[in-house]
Amino acid sequence: MKIALCSSFVPFVNGGYRNIVEWLELALQGAGHEVERVYLPEVDAPDLLFKQMAAFRFVDLAAADRIICFRPQSHLIRHPHKIIWFIHHLRPFYDLWDSEYRGFPADTEHRGIRDALRTADTAALHEAKKVFSNSQVVSDRLRRYNGIDSEPLYPPVLGAESFHHRTMNDEIVCICRIEHHKRQHLLVESLKYCRTPVRLRLCGAASGSDYVGSLARTAEEAGVADRVALDNRWISQEEKIDHLADCLAAAYVPVDEDSYGYPTLEAAHAAKPVLTTTDSGGPLEFVLNEINGLIAEPQPEAVALAMDRLYTDKEASRRMGVNAKARIDELKIDWAHVLQRLLA
């Protein structure tokens, strides 16, 4: 089958939104399909939004037997056999409209843009043969904002067999983009309240230097700089595998994330427990409190208690890690299941 994988991308910004497309491409090719990736650039600027939407609308993929669309606004592409694996809305116009992350005024002009966008999204989503999401969180948003029913289809990682458990040192690792909404600052602030010598390792690239600088200053001011390793870059896969093999646990504490996130899944493949928070969204679909990880209130004191608990009770941490790995099978997070559903 000839399959086109369609998505948008932010130039020079990597992340899970690229992985889901590129890893699916490899899985489809391994199953004997002919695959093309179709990317168009996306810039978060309201005045460019409709031009970007029109660019997708005029893409001609008639040569494909089927298209699978991921990141907005790729779902606007026309095709008689359009499948959508929806990973998030343009959130400032949806669930982040009333938050600090909107980034533009809630005036008449932007309300008009918001309403027109939602109308166009809903119409394009209705064109699909089938709509999947990457989480129940996103399915709930599709139902709430667009009146669209969708099936959660959890994205696996590539090369899951490379992740393994080797030991448990004194580090809690957080490997993801370093951005304010990922809340690495919450982890650094929490370390100040820890009573154990637990350490923190933050790995990932940032879109700018301001937030990274603020993390370093926070660590210095809190007197915990000697217990925070801050690696502002995309570490290699080999480094990631090593960090997860040896760490005490992983932490992933974003604000109302769309899905459980690859950091959660990679840690589980390494049989390590995951620390998250009650307002983190998608990770709560995977993490079960005190079963395969810990869920804390999003305050430094509460997160510190969880970090200390992971450190002081290594046997419980080991047991939760084993359960985290088993959770992957419980939720059918594997490429065979993904292909079966997308190609049905």
For each predicted feature, which ranges?
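Short hydrophobic beta-strand element within catalytic cores of glycosyltransferases
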Residues: H269, P273-T277
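A short, well-ordered alpha-helix in the C-terminal region of glycosyltransferases
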Residues: A302-L305, R309, A316-E330, H337
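C-terminal alpha-helical cap of glycosyltransferases
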Residues: K332-A344
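Conserved acidic donor-binding segment of nucleotide-sugar-dependent glycosyltransferases
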Residues: N289-E290, L294-P300, R309-K314
